Amino acid sequence: MAIEKTLSIVKPNAVKKNVIGDIYSRFEKAGLKIVAAKMTQLDDDRAGGFYEEHKARPFFGELVEFMTSGPVLIQVLEGENAVALNREIMGATNPENAAEGTIRKDFADSLSENAVHGSDSTESAAREIAYFFDAAEIFSR
């Protein structure tokens, strides 16, 4: 099995609900290590740049507005098959379709306010991690 890194964001609605510890506990119980983390308030440019691939989609403006509506917690997770494992822990993008016990089923408010972001591939993970973290900020253990 491959040791991978993936990016995770606890979105503004989950930060506001004060469920960061619950979410972190799920990462760790699944065997993922948190090797970098920062809380920040994204501005329009930073959020828009991160979600650049969605710029032409009709939901882009709403997505940027939501992601800038409050602080987010951004972390790098590391472990065996971290990308797929994190996506499994998160659950389906639409919380109505998410399995019981997943982060989105338990903490999302809607499709657009779905509590967490996770990289969808190792390529995306590398790009997304570099967007928010310098190599010196990541501490593999």
UniProtKB/Swiss-Prot annotation:
The active site is at 117 (pros-phosphohistidine intermediate). GO terms for biological process: CTP biosynthetic process; GTP biosynthetic process; UTP biosynthetic process. ATP binds at residues 11, 59, 87, 93, 104, 114. It is an enzyme of class 2 (transferase). Its cofactor is Mg(2+). InterPro entries: NDK-like_dom, NDK-like_dom_sf, Nucleoside_diP_kinase. GO terms for molecular function: ATP binding; metal ion binding; nucleoside diphosphate kinase activity. GO terms for cellular component: cytoplasm. Keywords: ATP-binding, Cytoplasm, Kinase, Magnesium, Metal-binding, Nucleotide metabolism, Nucleotide-binding, Phosphoprotein, Transferase. Its EC number is 2.7.4.6. It catalyses: a 2'-deoxyribonucleoside 5'-diphosphate + ATP = a 2'-deoxyribonucleoside 5'-triphosphate + ADP; a ribonucleoside 5'-diphosphate + ATP = a ribonucleoside 5'-triphosphate + ADP. It is found in: Cytoplasm. The keyword Magnesium applies. Major role in the synthesis of nucleoside triphosphates other than ATP. The ATP gamma phosphate is transferred to the NDP beta phosphate via a ping-pong mechanism, using a phosphorylated active-site intermediate. Homotetramer. HAMAP family: NDP_kinase (MF_00451). Belongs to the NDK family. This is Nucleoside diphosphate kinase.
